[in-house]
Swiss-Prot record:
GO terms for molecular function: metal ion binding; UDP-3-O-acyl-N-acetylglucosamine deacetylase activity. Its EC number is 3.5.1.108. Zn(2+) binds at H81, H237, D241. Keywords: Hydrolase, Lipid A biosynthesis, Lipid biosynthesis, Lipid metabolism, Metal-binding, Zinc. Pathway: Glycolipid biosynthesis; lipid IV(A) biosynthesis; lipid IV(A) from (3R)-3-hydroxytetradecanoyl-[acyl-carrier-protein] and UDP-N-acetyl-alpha-D-glucosamine: step 2/6. This is UDP-3-O-acyl-N-acetylglucosamine deacetylase. It catalyses: a UDP-3-O-[(3R)-3-hydroxyacyl]-N-acetyl-alpha-D-glucosamine + H2O = a UDP-3-O-[(3R)-3-hydroxyacyl]-alpha-D-glucosamine + acetate. It holds the Pfam family LpxC. Catalyzes the hydrolysis of UDP-3-O-myristoyl-N-acetylglucosamine to form UDP-3-O-myristoylglucosamine and acetate, the committed step in lipid A biosynthesis. Its cofactor is Zn(2+). Gene3D superfamilies: lpxc deacetylase, domain 1, lpxc deacetylase, domain 2. HAMAP family: LpxC (MF_00388). GO terms for cellular component: membrane.
Length: 301
């Protein structure tokens, strides 16, 4: 039996403080309750600068390394970890007030966001939000990378990563997910990166907030971190990213996701593809303001 979902917000505002991954500077984020139908909206406030950026597919302006939302003048980077926590809680209406151009990295997972939002209490509205159950296979492809979505009455993910590293060669997982399983098995998984890449980025003034406190760091043949939260934490984090990205569609998209070496670009392409195929809207409706709709080869059945 398919679940009936209701629009939700938080009961009280909650403040979240952390550092930006790239700037290394303090970021203040406040989540505010919002009326039913508001959607998820970032409110950027920095001195006299103000901007309102809705979380929607047409506002995705970059998918390199992280997912970035923008309005043509302003942008908010690295939104996916926060959005994954919002998705897991079923929240549909929030104002996210922020004083920087990137969401704080926290511990590199979605867990701090989940805990903060849960502490604010959850309010359920009478209005229903309808999940999307795909009726036909859909896929997006970029060379040897792909993301497939198959019809299924349950949310399920089969994900494989295949980096040129002894610990990440063919790391994979198949998992059936409900909201509680996502909270326990996916949201605690931290982002990961390679030491050589971190050093190169920091030499360019980027990733200044990156550390062992907020990322899994891999050396040539091992981990710098003393302990992992899961044996396959890295591939679990890719699922976290997937749901943070897919949630930008504005409706839960249910099916069996099959991913191999996918990432933010394919995640967003799939969300656009699903929304276009389900609503009957022209795919151009979801075209982002600054980047082409698909830089990827796309096939639809």
């Amino acid at each position: 039996m398919k679940e009936i979902l209701y629009r939700k917000s938080i009961q009280d505002r909650v403040r979240i403080k952390g550092i930006g991954l790239h700037s290394g500077k303090e970021v203040n984020l406040t989540a505010h309750p919002a009326p039913s139908g508001t959607g998820i909206v970032f409110e950027y406030r920095k001195g006299l600068e103000k901007a309102s950026i809705s979380v929607e597919l047409s506002n995705v302006v970059d998918t390199s390394n992280a997912t970035t939302l923008g309005d043509g003048l302003h942008k908010i980077q690295t939104v996916e970890h926060l959005l994954a926590a919002i998705y897991a809680l079923g929240l549909t209406d929030l104002i996210l007030e922020i004083d920087a151009v990137e969401v704080p990295i926290m511990d590199g997972s979605s867990l701090p966001f989940l805990q903060a939002l849960e502490s604010a209490g959850i309010v359920k509205y009478p209005e229903i939000i309808e999940p999307i159950y795909v009726q036909n296979p859909l896929w997006v492809v970029d060379g040897d990378k792909y993301l497939v979505l198959l019809p299924s009455d349950e949310l399920k993910v089969t994900y494989t990563i295949d980096f040129n590293h002894p610990l990440l060669k063919g790391q994979n997982i198949t998992i059936s997910l409900d909201k509680e399983t996502i909270k326990q098995e996916i949201l605690p998984a931290r982002t990961f990166g390679f030491l050589k890449d971190v050093e190169a980025l920091q030499a360019k003034g980027l990733a200044m907030g990156g550390s062992l406190d907020n990322a899994i760091v891999l050396t040539q043949d091992g981990y710098l971190n003393q302990q992992l939260r899961f044996e396959n934490e890295c591939v679990r984090h890719k699922i976290l990213d997937l749901f943070g990205d897919i949630s930008i569609a504005g409706r839960p998209i249910i099916g069996h996701y099959l991913a191999s070496k996918a990432g933010h670009a394919l995640d967003i392409s799939m969300a656009k593809l699903v929304m276009s195929s389900v609503t009957g809207d022209e795919i151009s409706k979801y075209k982002s303001r600054r980047i082409p709709l698909f830089k990827r080869k796309v096939a639809v059945v």
